[in-house]
Amino acid sequence: MGNPSNRTSMRGQLTLRGVVIGVLGCVIITASSAYKALKMGALPWPIIFAAVISLFFLKLMGNASLNEANVTHTIMSAGAMVAGGLAFTIPGAWMLGYADQISWLDMFIVALAGTILGLLATALIHRHFIVDAALEFPTGNAAAQTLRATEAGGKTGKQLFGSMAIAGIYSVLRDALGVVPSMLCTLNIPGVTFAIYNSPMLLSIGFLVGFAPVAFWFAGALLGNFGIIVGGTAAGLFDIVTAQGIVKSLGMGLMMGFGVAVVLKDILPQVAGIVRGLAADSSTDTDEQSLISGSLKLDAGIIGLGTAAIAVIIAVALDLGPVPAVIVTLFTFVTTIMSAQSCGQTGIDPMEIFGLIVMLIVAAFAQLAQVKLFFIAGIVAVACGLAGDVMNDFKAGAVLGTNPRAQWIGQAIGGIVGALVAAAVMVALVTAYGPDAFGPDKSFVAAQSSVVATMVSGIPSVPWFAGGFIAGIVMYWLGIPAMMIGLGVYLPFYMSLTAFLGSCVKLAYDKWAAHRDAGSGLSGKEKASKDAAFQEQGLVVASGLLGGESVVGVILAFVSVGLSLLG
């Protein structure tokens, strides 16, 4: 990727209409991402969806380049991972009874601090990971290819908004009016919530993630629910309550072991090379490679002042104190590098694991109230989540020839908007549903937050957690997706079953596409083009179903809060 002059190449890429479209989309995607992360315990990358929508709306307003769409979707998707960072950590404090000790301002400061630290870190590491190391960043690469495939236009808008409307109306009928049931095909199995969740969103998640990964997810669900809970209790090894604690501990251990294994296997061996690379980059940099101000010297000053300011803010406003604030700030830079490396090589960003690691490091050096530990995990998770999103966007920009400074500025706009929206949505949800609605087997499973809460308060079964932790590390080294298995073990069975059904639909969809093309007589290039359009159609419809239910869920929460305020 070349780096032409920032001031000239930004023209036509970072535009007023792009900013407006991006900010509006950012509000919707951030709100729906917070809801998805809490409701489903998962948050798929929104970059490809945002890329398709950005180009569609820009084309409605006239001629649009792929570079303008690239910057617009950078703004649009930025808030999603900010919301994820909050949703994967802060609700753990609600589960422990600290809801009244966390205000909207606290959550906004956590989100803003993580956003700014993530932005400053990515300004430093962009050149190394994107230009010099040239890591794959599969999600960013896919977003670039999707933009190219979508450029010709088509039925994207009708497919998207039609599916969003269907899912939204269905959600109102289910959640607001009670016309349709939330669960289907329920069976009374002691200790197991066996049912199909009547949710377009969860079916869509299974479709979007794909059959193979979700098959491992479902295998974990079968192991935890029928292997341990049903099998273990039937054999008289333990009672149902003990079995459920074992399952939660095992699931958490597998997920955390996976996250630590990513750090040990894929990231730490690269740290020395990364540091050498960053040092080499700085010796050859020119002002054209500045992402913040257009001047590298001014960038250095801004990064230094910004870092110091954030350390002071979290020390004072969040009452962490000077030493914990400095530790958090410094280790956040380290973990954003780890996040970038992980996303670049695997497409996975275990941001809540990085938050846990820094939280435990700080807890070893300082005596802080439990609620403050969640703030630390939240700051780090937001920074790492945003860093993963930024670096994927940078990769898409490298493929398309977009100016990285335009993208970084767009990411800053979207990240700050996302911090505001994410904090507001979190407050709306906990106010509307109450803190007791969050946790395992509750309305909002908040799986990652529950892991954080457990690490703070105590693990139900330490031996099973330790076994899962070791197994997670070993499985990752063997190429087995321990994170997906652990997620299946941990989540309620009805969620895993529903996601699995969605992945089966994706399997059938792919087989239908292959069968349809087999006897078409088209050339290889024509088949590839037709298949890409068919896959895009599935992506858009599934994303619309997912987005429609998520957005309506957030709207219903705000309506509930408004009605309660009116008395």
Question: Whereabouts are the PLM-identified features?
Answer:
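Alpha-helical multipass membrane-protein architecture
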Residues: 1-567
